[in-house]
Amino acid sequence: MDSKAVSPLIGFVLMLAIIMGLIGIMQAQWVPVWNKEVEAEHLSKLEFEASEIPKIMFISATTGKQGVASIDAGCEYPNRGFLINPSTASTSLKAIPLSVDVKFNETLPNGSLFRYSNKFTTYAIIVQPNYFYMQKPEIIVEHSAVIKTSGNSALNVSSPVSFSRNKVHLFIVNSTFSSISTPNTLNLQFIPVSYGGDTFVKNASITLKVLDETFDWWNKTLKNIFGAGNVTADGSRKEMTFRLFNTTLSMSYLIVQASIGERAKLNERIEPYRIFATSSNTLSMLKGEQRELNVKVLDIYNNPVRGYSRVSYSVVSGGDKCRIVSASPQTDEKGVFTVTVEAVNSGNCDVEFRIDSINSGFNKTKFSITVIPVSSGGLGGQGYLSFTPASRGLVEIYHGPVNGFIDPTKPPAESPRDLITDPNWEPYALEDKELAAYNDGSWDWWSGEYVPTSGYLEKTQNNAQSKQNSQKNHASQLFEFNVGDVQMSSLKVFWNGIAWLDVQNNRNDGVVLYVWNGTGWEYLCDTTSSSEVWLQCEKRGNYIQNKKVYLLIVQNDWTQTWKGNRDSQIYTDYIELDILT
């Protein structure tokens, strides 16, 4: 053999062996390191995409529009030449059933107490990448929180958007899938079915069923939000119970479905759960007067049932005393159904609203009406005059503090002139006075202001608001009605609004209404509710002083800043004075 030919061959074989050895080392040691970096980068992206899911649910639940969260499920490993890489790693999604138990007491506008108790199934969504090199962590979307678990540890990815001290918004999520695995982009579509309602609750109890691996995380998180004394953890049942005080509670029901590519369509209709009056169930009307009666239809999630037309209504007694003139074709965006009734003859009549599909005691409500005969006064035979701030120049509104202890048996000592000239009192601007003429505002406890709900509110404004935060001052409002030279035999006042003291478990919410008799304030009516209510006050007598009638509204409790933030507040959304001759 030619030695000169053998030497290059041996060298080539040795070189090839060295290269193959290096490739083997790279394949065994370096490729896993490089691919772990790829997986870590993909995991970070998955965490970000999962953290967007609660935000999308919140937007869908507040706007009523479908939201989509995209999950880049495939982890692609780059081409490394002669090195061998696995195929694209897929990601699995699982929907795990949990539960939410909700209990609260609600004071209705008519003053009655509604006790609510329901338990719902909701789903947690678990995102788990099927990596070849790293451990397979779970990214859990549960009760609006995003938590990453690996081994025995649970780490916060994003805090729950559902919970704060002043606002709780529960997402009841129903899933159309149980598990799915794909290396492709996955769209999670959230379809809001029930949304748009909220309830101010004095006290409530919420119980969340949570996953075993997130139980300790929830125990710590909820105690940080609501206080350790308000949270109870049941380790055996994996349930967290927390209590709410003076909080706005909302529940939204959404359906989530997973799809690859185009969005799917899904329709589900929520049926009515209860119907109730939006004002007092008892009222007085003058013969010939027409008035709207409003009821609200809510579903089991305490949200308005919109576009519902199967509301039955009729005069169930006293058919010769009043009659129904017209009715709305269906419920509006707030779930309100309206009937216009006319007082025909003096006496009593009842108007009932009913939904036959509701199989409970919440399926009907009734208005009891007293029809008052019209006296012959100097008003062209009509018998009454009506005044609201919508009539420019007819009503002046002032606001400021009333000092000292006030109750219905001990009215304020200040006269209307004392209040008007008090430097601590001031009049409302024209636009605020006009706003108090319409029942068009709704109180948002989260933002702390009235929210516009009709064309009368061109911008968010404080509707005839009075807030006092100095010691022993009641928030108060004075309404000066310029009624002119008329005769009065009695008066009737309609007031819609809300009044409260900023302190938990307070028993002194609400207002007292007074009328000025020329020498002092006389009691008209009152409420101790912290919810938005309708008050109707009636009183016989002549309360016209120098062609004016003065009404005073005083919040029930005074501020005590030396004890902390206890602000006495009133919002008036509607006021009307009717003078009967």
Curated annotation (Swiss-Prot):
Keywords per UniProt: Signal
Residues in the signal sequence: 1-28
SUPFAM superfamilies: Invasin/intimin cell-adhesion fragments (SSF49373)
InterPro entries: Ig-like_fold, Invasin/intimin_cell_adhesion
Protein name in the entry: Uncharacterized protein AF_1625
